[in-house]
Regions:
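His/Asp/Glu-enriched, well-ordered alpha-helical/loop segment
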Residues: 232-239, 281-366, 382-383
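Active-site gating loops and adjacent loop-to-helix segments of metal-dependent hydrolytic enzymes
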Residues: 67-99, 106, 133-147, 212-237, ...
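Divalent metal-coordination and catalytic microenvironments
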Residues: 17, 31, 36, 49, ...
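Active-site microenvironment of metallo-dependent hydrolases
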Residues: 1-29, 33-34, 335-430
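Catalytic core of soluble alpha/beta enzymes
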Residues: 210-240, 245-258, 271-282, 296-307
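Alpha-helical scaffold segments that flank or form the walls of functional sites
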Residues: 69-135, 157-168, 417-422, 426
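Metal-coordinating catalytic core of metallo-dependent amide/deamination hydrolases
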Residues: 125-246
Length: 430
């Protein structure tokens, strides 16, 4: 890195960069960071050897599923869950989840992701791992009406974790409310959680209309689609972010736009499991904020948001038989500023003075990134997680390629991460 540091003032700069700037502009020059924020964007004539872009925001993941990466490949969703995933998850302990979470957080940071919305058991383990490794996030305790006491656990977990974060000032990591899906929570649970959320005031993280079967069975049960049903329970009153939305209707999209519910597009996972994929261009036409997510890496099988951008771009062009659908800038914003909006992240998602310095820095000297005629096109169609050389979260270097062996200098958790992961896999009998 050609980087100038001033350790006393915590002011430093990233020099000789292409920069993805507001207004869908590509600039050249330096980004100056002071403390947690961007202090200056200095445009000048230079020969860039790197790209600085907003940090990537993964709006739907099950991070600890690094433990089961690739398990059950080739099975459709319901068989994949019932035969491969649920039996292993039933054996997972908090220690196992922590090991998988730390490994997944490191994988994401090494690929330029600065924030993740995670849905998994033992959310406190994920939350603490995020604060220790140095990443932003939204966690949640998964709402399931068949688990005794889960409603009360969800409410208390959200309240107590967020109070801990605020009192300890450990970073932008908060717990949102969550139900797994319409089909795993009954109406009584949804309405009770919605009522409790009048005090908590948190957005909802939920799976919606991932498969045709799920979508149609909800209509048979309630006479309405999952989105319409959830809206009627009041659980969307403080907004949210809905993963998948593969089978959502135009009316569903209108409800989402009205309620401030973002659509989280998971193209790789949906394609791998044969579910189809969300009608993203139509959702955008109807005013829905669309973000991107990897889903769990057991159905992906990585946490590479560059790959997610690439696949999202290709499938909608191919379906429409129109190369103008979802231009590169749209897809980049889905992975950055739209994701920040979906999760309620403050002052981030853009490279502008005063914004928080959540940044992804890419090495432009790689063979496959030259010539650089069209930077947005390169981001979406040529770049990958392995091209990232620096990830910055709130002005702090969270990952730097060429630091210690894994790029996480000074992070004690990282030192034992691989051994912890493999030990957990062994305990689970995999």
């Amino acid at each position: 890195m050609n980087r100038i540091d001033n350790q006393e003032s915590h002011r430093w700069r990233i020099e000789n960069c292409f920069m993805l700037l507001p207004g869908r502009r590509v600039g050249r020059g330096d980004v100056v960071i002071d403390g947690e924020r961007i202090a200056a964007v200095e445009e000048r004539d230079c020969k860039p050897d790197k790209l600085v872009m907003p940090g990537l925001v993964n709006c739907h993941g099950h991070t600890a599923m690094t433990l089961v990466r690739g398990l059950g490949g080739g099975l459709p969703l319901q068989r994949w869950l019932d035969e491969a995933i649920f039996p292993v998850e039933a054996k997972m302990t908090a220690k196992d989840v922590r090991a998988g979470a730390v490994w997944g957080i490191m994988e994401m940071l090494a690929g330029g992701t600065t924030c993740v919305a995670d849905m998994y058991d033992f959310p406190g383990e994920m939350g603490r791992a995020l604060t220790e490794v140095g990443m932003k996030g939204r966690i949640c305790r998964v709402g399931l009406s068949f688990v005794p006491g889960r409603l009360e656990d969800c409410i208390e977990s959200t309240r107590s974790f967020n109070e801990w974060v605020d009192s300890q000032k450990v970073g932008d990591v908060y717990e949102d409310i969550c139900i797994h899906s319409e089909y795993l929570t009954d109406e009584k649970f949804c309405r009770a959680l919605a009522e409790a959320n009048r005090e908590l005031k948190r957005p909802l993280h939920v799976h919606v209309s991932e498969t045709r079967k799920e979508h149609e069975e909800c209509i048979a049960r309630h006479g309405k689609t999952p989105i319409a049903y959830l809206a009627d329970t009041g659980i969307l009153d403080f907004g949210g972010y809905a993963a998948h939305c593969v089978w959502c209707t135009d009316d569903d999209f209108r409800i989402m736009a009205e309620k401030g519910v973002s659509l989280v597009h998971n193209p790789t996972s949906n394609m791998k499991l044969g579910s189809g994929f969300a009608r993203v261009p139509r959702a955008m036409e109807l005013g829905v904020n669309v973000a991107l997510g990897t889903d769990g890496c057991a159905s992906n099988d990585n946490l590479d948001m560059f790959e997610e951008m690439h696949i999202a771009s290709l499938i909608h062009k191919g379906l429409a038989q129109d190369p103008t659908v979802l231009p590169a800038w749209d897809v980049i914003e889905m992975a950055t500023k739209n994701g920040a909006k979906a999760l309620g992240l403050a002052d981030t998602g853009e490279i502008a003075v005063g914004k928080r310095a959540d940044l992804c820095v890419v090495d432009m000297m790689r063979f496959h990134l030259a010539p650089a005629f069209d930077i947005p096109n390169l981001v979406v169609n040529s770049m990958g997680a392995a091209d990232v050389e620096l990830t910055v979260v709130d002005g702090c270097i969270a990952y730097e390629k060429g630091g210690n062996d894994c790029g996480f200098d000074g992070c004690l958790v990282a030192n034992t991460a691989r051994a912890d992961l493999l030990a957990a896999v062994g305990r689970l009998g995999l």
